[in-house]
Each structure stands twice: as structure tokens, then as C-alpha cells.
Amino acid sequence: MRVGIVGAGRMGRLHARTLLELPDPPDLVVHDVDPDGAHRLAQELAAGTKAQVTVERELADTVTKADAIVVATPATQRRAPLLAAARAGLPVFCEKPLTADETEAAELVEALAHTRLHVGFQRRCDPEYQRLRELIAAGELGRVLLVRCTAFDHRPPADAYEETAGDIFTDCLIHDIDAVHWLTGQPTVAVQADGARLLAGSGYDVATAVLTLADGARAVLSASRLDPHGYDHRVEVLGTKGSLSVGLDARTPLRLLGQDGTGCPPGPGAQPAYQDFTDRFEAAYRREVLAFVRTVTEGAPSPCTGQEALRAQRVAAAAGRAARTGTRVELDPAPHGAPAALVAGAAR
């Protein structure tokens, strides 16, 4: 098998390395709008692997030579490779969101409807999140009343990052929005949100959102671009029979204040705090790439379809609008794609 890696940045490197660590690694074809960056990554990947790693300057040649495509470019550059993969009928793994624009994302979902599409919401492949979902589905918590998500990054991104990745809702909290939908099985029907610029960045660096789910339950999401102690991402679910938490362990960058006034870590045997998302979700990233390989080689179902990803993106975009306008935004819970005319235009 030969996999095209479109995007030679951090996520392209991460997914390519994971593919090469497989017992029978596929050959890789690397493409980036920066040819020098593509060559640097290919040289780095080729060291110590039996797989062949080559570079293609043209996107069309990359698609022609590949059996599957991994799209890991900035969000504003995903349209072209996704449409090329759609025309070729290739299985596609794409980082979230599908693109920075909500309407364009709907067009892409329609264009990719006949392909095997896996969108990279890695929490769906995290063992702890998967176990939490199993327990919720089994009724261990009873009826879900409230979901609370914490999403604190260790360090703020560069100002230019938001120009290609989207705001804190579309870039960061979209993961938690998708997790809420996936864990509870309930879509969002309304959202209220707020954000503030308290640091030196150009966009919101702290934000909150309250989701109203179709069954009446609520989800409260909190995000920050800065946590001086490390990377802190957690979820808590409260139901009529009990509650469960994921992400609270000896590496969580949080200290509990005891009655004696001293702080202690949340778990026994304190360890260095998580530093970033690749640290916290290392296992999830490996498992999602393995899931994509099974989608390609065995026809296994995608852990996250285009329609599911689009639903999360629509809620994230609505949260951004709610924060900017100070209003509650109502949403249609049913997934739907773009008008056929838009899709036809996008595919040309």
C-alpha cells in the first residue's frame, strides 16, 4: 500500500511516523506547498525504515500514485487535496476541521460522500473516552444530565496560527463538541458562548460554551490558550445514577488544595505534567491511524464520518457567532449537506 501525506508540518509528520511504525509499513508519498519542507520530512522519515518514502511536487501526481491520502495541511489549504482525493475515489484521512469555512466544509462532505472518509477527532480513539462511552451506553450513569469539558492548552499558539486554524471554538473546542455528541449520542440544538482576549494574542484566548442537547441535557465547555503548568484536557459526565471523569490522573497539571492548605497532585505518584496534545493523546493518535488503515485495507467503518465532523463544525461556528453577538444560537440537529449546485461547482 502507498499512502500520500499531504502536508509536511507537525500533524503530517506525526501521522507519517505512526504509519511507518506499523509491522508492515506502507510506502509514503510526501507533498507540501513548500517543496523544501516536503523533502526535509521525507529525508527524516526515510531514515531507519524499510518503506520507500518519496516526494511529489504536484498534488495531482501524489494522488495518482497513492492508494489512500492523509490530509494534514492547515485548514485553509485542505479543499484542493480533498477534492482531488474525491475525484480519484481514494480513502481519505483528514485532520479536523475539514476546512476553515463551514459552508465549504458542507460542500466537501457532499463531494466526498462516495469515498471512505475519516476525520481526525482523535478522542474517539482514546481508550479512556471509549470506555466512558461504553459505560454511558450501558446505562451505568443513568440518564445523562450534564457533561463538563476542560480544554486548557499549555502555551498559546502564534498569532498567525488562528488565521489558518480558526478561532478557539473551531480549532480547540470543536474536539469537545464532537466528544459530547459521540459520548451522549445527542446532537446540539442550541448554543450560548462567550470569549475574551486576556493575553497578547489576536483572538479569544479564554472561552466558554453551553450546549443544549436534543434530550435537554447540558454540556459546559471551558477553554484556555494558556495553562502555565501543562496541558489539561478532561471530561466529566453526571447522570442520574452517578458520575465519571476522564483525564484526571497523576499527569494532570492540577493541584488539589487540602485542608492543611498544601497542594497535591490529583493522583498518586505525581509525574511530569502533560505538555501538549500529542503527549496526552499519544495512544489515541496511534489508534486512529490504525483505524484508518483498517478502513483502507478491510473496509472497516470510519470512526468519524464527514457528516459527524460537519455537525461538530456547525456547532463550533455557531458558538463563535454566539460569542461575538451575545445571543443564543438555535441549530437544526439533523445532519445535512450542501446544495447540489454548490457541490457541482466545488468539484470543477
Swiss-Prot record:
UniProtKB keywords: Antibiotic biosynthesis, NAD, Oxidoreductase, Streptomycin biosynthesis
Residues annotated as transmembrane: none
Residues annotated for NAD(+) binding in this entry: 2-32
Gene Ontology molecular-function annotations: nucleotide binding; oxidoreductase activity
Pathway: Antibiotic biosynthesis; streptomycin biosynthesis
Keyword NAD: yes
Listed EC numbers: 1.-.-.-
Record family assignment: Belongs to the Gfo/Idh/MocA family.
Protein name (database record): Streptomycin biosynthesis protein StrI
